């Protein structure tokens, strides 16, 4: 995974984390986002919520640390020909490799508005999935093991009706917009080719 990065997106310094304002990713535009907060709802083995851009990579790295090896990385890219997504996988990763992917590509993955990505465990199917408009989903057999991570990052665990997302702000007068972004001369569309030599492939 050749290439440079400007900072460690997995850094967990509290000074870098505990911010009061909800921030949008570069590829996401919705009016009124400052009203939101990073939060999630836990129901059984499933967690869903919305995250401020500044902590998305830290959540990804924190969950990766708790996934059982081997780990897989997946990336969904828009496919205009099929009006859907092309999905790419990189299987059988160690935690070190999964974290290296975030360190190398985390900035563009998090800030891009049109793609979706995540990491999961081949061993027990636990998974984190980042979707449109800064929402995320986690499947975990033991959600309690993530409570310390959520608390440290300032993610409120709330009732289902209390999860307010960017989608809730979108209407005829406040239309949302997502776009592809570039970081260090690369976009998310470069990732499958860059990782092809490591074994990344397109799902059939």
Language-model features: locations:
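Short, compositionally biased low-complexity segments
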Residues: 29-38, 72-81, 165-167
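Single conserved hydrophobic/aromatic residue that forms the stacking wall/gate
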Residues: 1-10
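N-terminal domain-start signal
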Residues: 13-50
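Acidic, proline/glycine-rich low-complexity IDRs
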Residues: 7, 129-204
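Surface-exposed, low-hydrophobicity interaction/linker segments
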Residues: 44-126
């Amino acid at each position: 995974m050749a290439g440079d990065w400007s900072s460690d997106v997995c850094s967990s310094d509290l000074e870098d984390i505990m911010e009061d304002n909800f921030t949008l990713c570069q590829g996401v535009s919705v009016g009124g986002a400052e009203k939101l907060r990073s939060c999630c709802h836990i129901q059984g083995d499933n967690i869903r919520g919305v995250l401020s851009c500044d902590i998305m990579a830290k959540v990804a790295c924190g969950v990766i640390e708790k996934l059982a090896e081997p780990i897989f990385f997946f990336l969904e890219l828009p496919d205009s020909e099929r009006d859907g997504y092309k999905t790419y996988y990189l299987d059988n990763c160690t935690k070190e490799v999964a974290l290296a992917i975030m360190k190398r590509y985390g900035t563009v993955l998090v800030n891009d508005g049109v793609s979706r990505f995540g990491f999961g465990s081949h061993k027990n199917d636990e998974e984190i999935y980042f979707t449109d408009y800064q929402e995320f989903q986690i499947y975990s057999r033991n959600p309690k093991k993530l409570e310390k991570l959520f608390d440290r990052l300032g993610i409120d665990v709330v009732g289902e009706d209390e999860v307010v997302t960017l989608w809730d702000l979108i209407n005829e007068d406040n239309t949302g917009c997502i776009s592809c972004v570039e970081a260090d001369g690369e976009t998310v569309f470069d990732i499958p080719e860059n990782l092809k030599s490591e074994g990344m492939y397109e799902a059939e």
